[in-house]
C-alpha cells in the first residue's frame, strides 16, 4: 500500500487520495465476524512483531468502507488488522495491512516482499498468549487478479495474511499495479520454527 493510493486489492486509504486516482472495488472484504470477535475481546490482537524486518508495532483496527474495500491505516508507520475478520489463532485468515511507502520514503511494510519461507511473525493478543506464525510463501498479484477468496477466508485452518502494495507505480492512476501478499501458518509447538 502506498501513501499515494492504496487502491485495488480492497486495501486503500479512505481519505486524501489523489482526485484522479482510480478506485476499483476488485476484492471486497466480507462484512462478517462482528459478533464473534466481540465474544472473544480478550484475544484481540494488540501488536505485531516481524523480527526479520525489524517491525514491532501496535495493531490498529480497520473496517470495511462503504464500497466494500478494506480501509488502510491513517499513518504510514501503523499496521492495521481487519477487525471484522477472523482473529489471529482462530479458524480462517486474520488479515493485516500496512503501507509500502509514502511521499517521503519507505513505510512500515516496505520490506514485506523480502520475507523468506520460515520467517516468524508474532501477534501479541490481549489477555492471551501470543499467536506465532511462520511465512509459507510470498506472492505478488496484479490488482485485477487479487485472490479475495483465498485472502478473506473464514473457517478452515488458522492463518495470517499480510498485505501491502507492490509492483510498478502508475502515476497517471495514482496507485500501484500489484499487491504483495504474505501467507503465514501457525508455528507448530514442537517445530524448530518456534525458536526462529
Identify the meaning behind each predicted range.
Residues 2-117, 122-196:
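Solvent-exposed, non-transmembrane regions of membrane-associated and secreted proteins
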